[in-house]
Amino acid sequence: MNFQLDLIKDKVEFFEAASLQELEKKINTQIENNKAIMLRVKSVSHQTLVAEGRILYSAVVHFSAEA
């Protein structure tokens, strides 16, 4: 049996929440999870959407392998 592990070099994750605090908590949790596989934050992009009187916060986080 041949078993091979590949290194993850880049990973993009999407997050959304009803409040900024909840969004920040979700992102921070995933940052800690990705540290275990040696990925660090390369960039963060975020948006706010108002739809039907409600605010929705979203973010895209690009994780990259440590150099």
From Swiss-Prot:
Keywords: Coiled coil. InterPro entries: DUF2536. Residues 17-47 form a coiled coil. It comes from the Bacteria. This is Uncharacterized protein YrzA. It comes from Bacillus subtilis (strain 168). The lineage of its organism: Bacteria, Bacillati, Bacillota, Bacilli, Bacillales. The gene is yrzA.
